[in-house]
């Protein structure tokens, strides 16, 4: 359970950074 939550949080952080870079480019 804890591992899944940690993995999910890390993925969400990466996605946020990824989307931020896309919006900045656009």
From Swiss-Prot:
Keyword Chloroplast appears in the UniProt entry: yes
Name this protein carries in UniProt: Uncharacterized 3.3 kDa protein in psbJ-trnE intergenic region
Record's keyword terms, sorted: Chloroplast, Plastid
GO cellular component: chloroplast
Compartments, as annotated in UniProt: Plastid, Chloroplast
Chief localisation class: plastid
């Amino acid at each position: 359970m804890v591992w899944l939550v940690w993995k999910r949080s890390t993925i969400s952080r990466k996605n946020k950074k990824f989307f931020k870079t896309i919006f900045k480019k656009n």
